[in-house]
């Protein structure tokens, strides 16, 4: 698999079986790279990024020893996407008002006026 790059792409999460080397993805059989919110739809605090990275690490550790496949990457990506939605609904994450597109892909913002 050293020459094969597996990837999973969801709306806000991209996973690659690769490492970043001089801004390039280099396929790697024993490393996963997480690209979080590539379209900058959300405003991320360091604490929230850390929570998502910790969840990512938990998912990777839970799958350790298993087959690394498109399916296993999709499961991790889908779980992270759901976790991001939970953070948004809990008010820990917010939409970026300066984002390229305002499509509210995970539902309308939760503000006191709308609750």
From Swiss-Prot:
Q: How does it sit in the membrane?
A: Peripheral membrane protein
GO cellular-component term (any): plasma membrane-derived thylakoid membrane
- Segments spanning the bilayer are none
Keyword terms, alphabetized: Membrane, NAD, NADP, Plastoquinone, Quinone, Thylakoid, Translocase, Transport
* Localization: Cellular thylakoid membrane
The answer to whether the entry has keyword Magnesium is no
Question: What sort of enzyme, by top EC class, is this?
Answer: translocase
| EC numbers for this chain | 7.1.1.-
> What is this enzyme's catalytic activity, as reactions?
a plastoquinone + NADH + (n+1) H(+)(in) = a plastoquinol + NAD(+) + n H(+)(out); a plastoquinone + NADPH + (n+1) H(+)(in) = a plastoquinol + NADP(+) + n H(+)(out)
MF GO annotations: oxidoreductase activity, acting on NAD(P)H, quinone or similar compound as acceptor; quinone binding
Q: What does this protein do?
A: NDH-1 shuttles electrons from an unknown electron donor, via FMN and iron-sulfur (Fe-S) centers, to quinones in the respiratory and/or the photosynthetic chain. The immediate electron acceptor for the enzyme in this species is believed to be plastoquinone. Couples the redox reaction to proton translocation, and thus conserves the redox energy in a proton gradient. Cyanobacterial NDH-1 also plays a role in inorganic carbon-concentration.
This protein's assembly is summarised as:
NDH-1 can be composed of about 15 different subunits; different subcomplexes with different compositions have been identified which probably have different functions.
Q: Which family does it belong to?
A: Belongs to the complex I NdhM subunit family.
In Swiss-Prot or TrEMBL terms, this protein is called NAD(P)H-quinone oxidoreductase subunit M
Q: Which organism is it from?
A: Parasynechococcus marenigrum (strain WH8102)
């Amino acid at each position: 698999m050293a020459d094969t790059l597996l990837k999973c792409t969801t709306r806000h999460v991209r996973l690659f079986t690769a490492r970043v080397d001089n801004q390039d993805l280099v396929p790697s059989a024993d490393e996963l790279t997480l690209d979080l919110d590539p379209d900058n739809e959300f405003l991320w605090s360091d604490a929230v990024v850390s929570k998502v990275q910790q969840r990512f690490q938990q998912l990777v550790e839970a799958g350790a020893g298993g087959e690394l496949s498109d399916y296993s990457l999709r499961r991790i990506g889908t779980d992270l996407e759901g976790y991001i939605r939970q953070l948004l609904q809990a008010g820990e994450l917010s939409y970026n008002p300066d984002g390229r597109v305002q499509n509210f892909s995970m539902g309308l913002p939760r503000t006191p006026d709308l609750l």
